[in-house]
Amino acid sequence: MRGAGPSPRHSPRALRPDPGPAMSFFRRKVKGKEQEKTLDVKSTKASVAVHSPQKSTKNHALLEAAGPSHVAINAISANMDSFSSSRTATLKKQPSHMEAAHFGDLGRSCLDYQTQETKSSLSKTLEQVLRDTVVLPYFLQFMELRRMEHLVKFWLEAESFHSTTWSRIRAHSLNTVKQSSLAEPVSPSKRHETPASSVTEALDRRLGDSSSAPLLVTQSEGTDLSSRTQNPQNHLLLSQEGHSARSLHREVARTGSHQIPTDSQDSSSRLAVGSRNSCSSPLRELSEKLMKSIEQDAVNTFTKYISPDAAKPIPITEAMRNDIIAKICGEDGQVDPNCFVLAQAVVFSAMEQEHFSEFLRSHHFCKYQIEVLTSGTVYLADILFCESALFYFSEYMEKEDAVNILQFWLAADNFQSQLAAKKGQYDGQEAQNDAMILYDKYFSLQATHPLGFDDVVRLEIESNICREGGPLPNCFTTPLRQAWTTMEKVFLPGFLSSNLYYKYLNDLIHSVRGDEFLGGNVSLAAHGSVCLPEESHSGGSDGSTAQSSVKKASIKILKNFDEAIIVDAASLDPESLYQRTYAGKMSFGRVSDLGQFIRESEPEPDVKKSKGFMFSQAMKKWVQGNTDEAQEELAWKIAKMIVSDVMQQAHHDQPLEKSTKL
């Protein structure tokens, strides 16, 4: 396996070959351990040097900086640094087949492609919405229209309470360890020994108990918990801790610099314990305030959302409410950080089942999608993992004669996802048959839709498919990376500047505009009955009627505008001219000069009229009276006279030479 590149550090041994990132990582780790050993040796030498009265003043500064709390904090920091370094090295580690290589027409491989981490910003789950600060305001607006915003606010406050409570408990445990280490009397035989290891072990045990709970970081908007900013308190706690540690070192320096009797040593030790207790009292008070703030936040959340007297209580059972009360008012006087977890699950399920699907179809989510699409940072994952965007992208790829690349990526990614979901419990022969379908279509020498993969990739796919036990879930990883890179580097920039992309945006904007007008009418109907006390009923009704008429007029104008600019393709069909939907029976005849249709063929005399026709004629006579042919002839004569008079006035100089025959 080749290294990712040369080491960024400059050393005198630059001519030596680079050992790779793994060796450089181990070298840094060993160097860090050597520095820690050097610090431990220096601190031990400083503690031993206290016995000599000549060096007491010189080592006074070393004593102030070598307290047990300082060593414990250094140990924690070293562990965190080593963990972060190892994690960074693991993330940067790449197998040999992930090296950058050129794929000809398909471009260069994408080293950052990881299918399990790809997700679209345009399609969200409820958990992603609650943790995303961009889409969360839109979800809050949607829930406010439904008068269910208290569900979202409770979930956010409970999540923030859960995370901050665990951080406060860790800070309280750290302060307790420091107080116990400061208040412990020092024996004459172990007066000059540094209890760094014991403090570190006790701290690890205490923090290990609370590390089982996940520390969730949630950025909630609108939460008003009493004391959520614990950074100033922690800073003050650390400063008090350093002050108490320095007082302890001064006391040790005074008592250890001279040889005094045993009684004097006992009295000085009692004096040191008293001074340490007095110095640790502010630390204890701040720690108590920290724990009281946890209780206060829990009570505030319970009063706002869980109490039966709350303005908008969340939908939970009485048994669950009693369980929350028992966890807040524990027997040991401590608040359980997980007291709201069950209520959170109930609220989450209610939002997901009753509201979230409607939110995804609302104009609020369309507004969020428009914000993402117009932000200027649209990635390929946003397009491929969103159904609506994928539809327009597939049309663009079809116009570019590259739809086979997209179809291969979708099919191969779906195949690998299904195999990975089965976790090794799948039929190898069946999986091999499915993989051979993709191979015959895109990779073989007789492929129906060849994509241009070279022989190296084809041989790799053959070896991955034709293996004992069936193909692995990552058998198409290399061509998937190639197809992903090609779409990302070659086709995505063109799509983002194409007419299809702007059509997609236009469709979203039109849907938002129409839904806003419809939503305005719904909200107006919902709030129209609510009037202010000083307003009369008639005034409120008139105002609501006027507003509704304005809304309807706006909708009518909008619809007319949309209909005016949209050309129906069906209206351009020439065959539609010969379609006479409401035409009756065909008959032969002619049209006179007056526009009268004169039948030339009489109906068959032997055909009897149907009962329906006879009934209609009877009803016509009963309603309109007697309509015989004489009256109809008279009407046509009157019409003829009117037409003749008009013609004579128009052509007064020319006599009427011929008359119109009826």
UniProtKB/Swiss-Prot annotation:
Protein name: A-kinase anchor protein 10, mitochondrial
Free-text domain note: RII-alpha binding site, predicted to form an amphipathic helix, could participate in protein-protein interactions with a complementary surface on the R-subunit dimer.
Cellular component, GO annotation: cytosol; mitochondrion; plasma membrane; protein-containing complex
Source taxonomy: Eukaryota, Metazoa, Chordata, Craniata, Vertebrata
Main location, first listed in the record: mitochondrion
SUPFAM superfamilies listed in its UniProt record: Regulator of G-protein signaling, RGS (SSF48097)
Modified residues (Phosphoserine): 52, 189, 281
UniProt-listed SMART domains: RGS
Localization annotation: Mitochondrion; Membrane; Cytoplasm
Transit peptide: 1-28
This protein's record includes keyword Cytoplasm: yes
Region annotation PKA-RII subunit binding: where it falls in the sequence: 634-647
Tissue: Highly expressed in testis, kidney and lung, followed by brain, skeletal muscle, liver, spleen and heart. Also expressed in brown adipose tissue and pancreas.
Role this protein plays: Differentially targeted protein that binds to type I and II regulatory subunits of protein kinase A and anchors them to the mitochondria or the plasma membrane. Although the physiological relevance between PKA and AKAPS with mitochondria is not fully understood, one idea is that BAD, a proapoptotic member, is phosphorylated and inactivated by mitochondria-anchored PKA. It cannot be excluded too that it may facilitate PKA as well as G protein signal transduction, by acting as an adapter for assembling multiprotein complexes.
Biased composition (Polar residues): 256-280
Biased composition (Basic and acidic residues): 32-43
